[in-house]
Amino acid sequence: MDKNINVTLKVWRQKGPKEKGRFETYQLNNIFQGASFLEMLDILNEQLIKEGKDPVVFDHDCREGICGMCSLYINGHPHGAATGATTCQLYMRRFNDGDTITIEPWRSAGFPIIRDLMVDRSAYDKIIQAGGFVSVNTGGVPDANAIAIPKEDADLAMDAAACIGW
């Protein structure tokens, strides 16, 4: 059964691509374990704004595990310790009361940091715009690209899903 927990966050903060970054520590109290990880970051940002501080910059789009924009390192693992899930599919029930959670941007030469947890995905976006894709075996369920879908249909589907989460 989900309950409310208190967590300490160590969040990577970096003002720009050429600036030095550092970890900042924040305390969040009464976080419902049924909240998604991104909802928890939204709550942190609301708290920071109320305190007159800059919110943590992070990227997200679909919040459905499709787009990959929310990619983060959580406690040293891509997307957190859960396997087969993206950051937006991670829920706070994976954490315990009193846990310290370290949150870092996706670090790769191909994805330089823009600010805080947001990285420049333009190299990846160019591949996608050119019609490229990556086939990855995700386990027991059929791969998402097992049935070929024409690019035009996929584009229309993405347009229809663009408002989700807003």
Predicted regions and their residues:
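Signature of N-terminal electron-transfer/Fe-S-associated modules in redox systems
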Residues: M1-G165
